[in-house]
């Protein structure tokens, strides 16, 4: 009972803070926001533009959403910007990979973390992607960080899209442009890991109207929003795609790795990344089993290696497969990014497992797969990723329902040399999709918004 009362009181405090935040913004108040302090960036020149970047996850926390904000922060500093990051509280102990990624950033990047939200009543507060109680803490952290060094522009990267709402208040407070960056969609083609209730939809439309620019990672996402949101200004909706970082490949030049015929002469087909609901292995394992039953000779010619963390719900599928064909797949736990890149470089081919979520977007993994140089086996029925691999001549696309086509793809990969898949189109595409080139495009947007 005491816990229920405590959560109810915390919820009332959150609502009061929300009301104060909205009133202070409307009144253009000079009220000082509270904050938790942080690592204040070293000022490298008062004339340098100052970017305030909202990203709920940031190193040493590590997940698929951190790489784009990290890359922008790194290359913005190199381009002469000052960068302050407002981010969420750390969850758990940082991993070695997360610490390595943090250490890759210039020391002048300021990182300010929101305080953890107090436990509150789910029933008493509006529902929003990322959690309504988190709006105030990250806004407070950002405003405190920039109190004596106002930003030139504010960029909010989502999901979670709670950052968009917080960033809007801070941009209004400092009277600077707000740029929204959609790494995934919010209320249009909503992915399963994003909330899109009534509160989300109301605020998304409000923010899309007020933002100075809206950045999407694919033209398909931009088009979907323009078709779905009435009155959305097409002139301020831009595309800056994801990319790959050449600095991840500095050990050897891109494409220099030799084809992998390791493991006693077998062709190694590698999946590198997290196995979960966006990369489900069960359909692939079923088709692979059908191929091996029908073509025993392939058991001695190839092996599929899965490197990376695996969701518990799919461990049964792996166990079932290994009980029948123990020498045809290999399971490797998560590794640091440098080791993951090395695995991609050594592989004879790279496996991409795609859910229908990727029909309108391209997984970040594909950019690194393309840079690694090996042929790519896309196991998917539809989507932009398969279209891109076909267009670049970088691999093969196999539908999820046909083991005969999967068998044909295996035989094709075994027959063709690695160089067959390294087309001029692939090389040219990589040059225009490096993280440095794309950061330059984003910084141009941030420099020109008003």
Task: Label each residue range with its predicted role.
Residues 401-405, 418-447:
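A charged, aromatic-enriched C-terminal amphipathic alpha-helix characteristic of glycosyltransferases
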Residues 301, 306-339:
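Nucleotide-activated donor-binding/catalytic signature segment of Leloir-type glycosyltransferases, i.e.
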Residues 212, 344-359, 374:
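Acidic donor-binding loop of glycosyltransferase active sites
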Residues 220, 243:
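Carbohydrate-associated surface elements
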Residues 52, 260-279, 285-288:
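Conserved donor-binding/catalytic core segment of Leloir-type glycosyltransferases
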Residues 91, 174-179, 187-207, 246:
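Nucleotide-sugar donor phosphate/pyrophosphate-binding loop at the beta->alpha transition
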Residues 2-113:
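N-terminal subdomain of nucleotide-sugar transferases
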Residues 162-165, 169-173, 196-216:
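Membrane-proximal helix-turn-helix segments that form the acceptor-binding/catalytic region
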């Amino acid at each position: 009972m005491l816990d229920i009362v405590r959560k109810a009181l915390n919820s009332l405090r959150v609502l009061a803070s929300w009301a104060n935040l909205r009133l202070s913004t409307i009144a253009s108040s000079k009220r000082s926001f509270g904050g938790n302090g942080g690592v204040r960036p070293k000022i490298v020149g008062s004339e340098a533009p100052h970017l305030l970047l909202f990203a709920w996850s940031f190193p040493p926390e590590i997940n698929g959403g951190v790489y784009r904000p990290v890359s922008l922060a790194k290359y913005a500093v190199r381009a002469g910007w000052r960068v302050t990051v407002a981010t969420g509280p750390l969850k758990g102990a940082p991993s070695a990979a997360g610490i390595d990624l943090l250490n890759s950033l210039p020391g002048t990047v300021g990182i300010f973390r929101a305080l953890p939200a107090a436990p509150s009543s789910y029933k008493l507060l509006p529902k929003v992607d990322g959690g309504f109680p988190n709006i105030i803490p990250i806004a407070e952290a950002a405003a405190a960080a920039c109190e004596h060094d106002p930003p030139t522009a504010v960029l909010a990267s989502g999901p979670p899209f709670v950052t968009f709402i917080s960033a809007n208040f801070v941009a209004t407070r400092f009277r600077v442009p707000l740029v929204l960056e959609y790494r995934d969609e919010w209320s249009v083609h909503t992915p399963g890991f994003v909330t899109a209730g009534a509160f989300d939809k109301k605020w998304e439309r409000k923010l899309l109207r007020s933002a100075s620019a809206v950045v999407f990672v694919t033209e398909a996402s931009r088009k979907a929003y323009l078709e779905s949101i009435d009155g959305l200004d097409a002139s301020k909706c831009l595309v800056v795609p994801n990319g790959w970082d050449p600095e991840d490949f500095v050990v050897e030049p891109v494409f220099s790795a030799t084809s992998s015929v390791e493991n006693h002469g077998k062709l190694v087909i590698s999946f590198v990344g997290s196995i979960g609901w966006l990369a489900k292995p069960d359909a692939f394992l079923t088709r692979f089993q059908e191929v091996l039953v029908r073509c025993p000779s392939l058991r001695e010619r190839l092996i599929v290696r899965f490197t990376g963390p695996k969701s518990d719900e799919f461990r049964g599928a792996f166990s079932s497969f290994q009980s029948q064909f123990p020498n045809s797949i290999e399971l490797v736990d998560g590794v640091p990014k440098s080791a993951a890149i090395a695995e991609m470089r050594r592989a004879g081919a790279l496996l991409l497992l795609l859910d229908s979520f990727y029909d309108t977007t391209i997984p970040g993994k594909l950019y690194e797969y393309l840079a690694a140089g090996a042929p790519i086996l896309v196991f998917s029925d539809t989507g932009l990723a398969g279209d891109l691999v076909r267009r670049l001549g970088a691999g093969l696309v196999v539908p999820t329902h046909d083991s005969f086509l999967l068998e044909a793809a295996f035989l094709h990969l075994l027959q063709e040399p690695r160089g067959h898949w390294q087309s001029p189109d692939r090389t040219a595409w990589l040059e225009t999709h490096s993280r440095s080139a794309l950061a330059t495009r984003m910084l141009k947007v941030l420099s020109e918004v008003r």
